[in-house]
Regions:
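Secretory targeting signatures
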Residues: 1-23, 238-271
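Cyclophilin-like peptidyl-prolyl cis-trans isomerases
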Residues: 16-245
């Protein structure tokens, strides 16, 4: 019986083992936090209007080239005023072409053929990291057939899209797409944007299947007002431990103390 009591105390006071979390679930010191401020002004058959902020953490620790490129463009106000030119519900929302800017009235998609083909002047090399995958809300770099052709265009996943991951592509020479961040706040805005009516899905988030091919251009503008750097993830604050917040070492010492006390009491009772 005394052994059972001692084992119970060991289980009670010894900290359990916690599995390592995915790097995309945790924040890391020095990673930039960016904010996409967007607005959707609807029209007839366009669904509900919305506006707000999508907050993302960019993984500088895992994708330094890609993140540095994106942050440099943000600091130049490169993305301000651009609209999301390609939207596929339950897949991605895509933006980042400086030619996709409405001058006055939002352009009629059929006369807007060049939008979606442009980008910034410099390409960056393909950068993949096994820790970064296309989970819901992942942000990645759009590119052409050449893996090293990404410039400024990006997409945000509406739901997990692991078919885009490095190693999951069907073509032998296709390395996939480079993820470099994830949505921390505002995933509901990603979902709302993904559900707007487009040239290939006039009903938006409706029952009609999406027509293949075409630009998947929103019928009404999903406008990026600005993308800004809010902050960089600070170093974790080290607090003094107290009774309600003991460290693993403190718990182990406490457990040992209780066990020794129990043994001493047991010997005294038997003497």
């Amino acid at each position: 019986m005394r052994v059972a009591i001692l084992l119970s105390m060991i289980l009670l006071f010894t900290p359990g083992t916690v599995a390592d979390a995915s790097p995309m679930e945790n924040s890391y010191e020095g990673n930039p936090i960016v904010v996409i401020n967007l607005t959707y002004e609807s029209g007839i058959g366009g669904g509900d209007e919305f506006q707000g902020e999508i907050v993302l953490e960019l993984f500088l620790n895992w994708a330094p080239i890609t993140v540095t490129n994106f942050v440099d463009l943000v600091n130049q106000s490169f993305y301000d005023g651009i609209y999301f030119h390609r939207i596929i519900d339950d897949f991605v929302i895509q933006s980042g072409d400086p030619d996709c800017k409405a001058s006055g009235v939002y352009p009629v998609p059929i006369s807007d053929a060049s939008c979606g083909e442009g980008g910034s002047s410099e390409t960056i090399p393909f950068e993949a990291n096994a820790n970064l995958t296309h989970i819901n809300g992942a942000i990645g770099m759009a590119r052409g057939l050449d893996p090293d052709s990404a410039t400024s265009q990006f997409y945000i996943c509406d739901g997990p899209q692991h078919g885009l991951d490095n190693g999951n592509r069907t073509q032998e020479d296709d390395p996939g797409y480079a993820v470099f961040g994830v949505v921390r706040e505002g995933i509901e805005l990603v979902q709302a944007a993904a559900a707007v009516p487009t040239t290939n899905d006039p009903d938006g988030d409706g029952s009609s299947p999406r027509a293949p091919g075409g630009p998947d251009r929103p019928l009404y503008e999903v406008h990026i007002n600005s993308i800004t750097i809010r902050e960089y993830v600070p170093a974790p604050v080290v607090e003094n431990t107290d009774v309600e917040g003991l460290s693993g070492l403190s718990l182990s010492v406490s457990a040992l103390s209780i066990i020794l006390t129990a043994i001493a009491l047991s010997r005294k009772m038997n003497s």
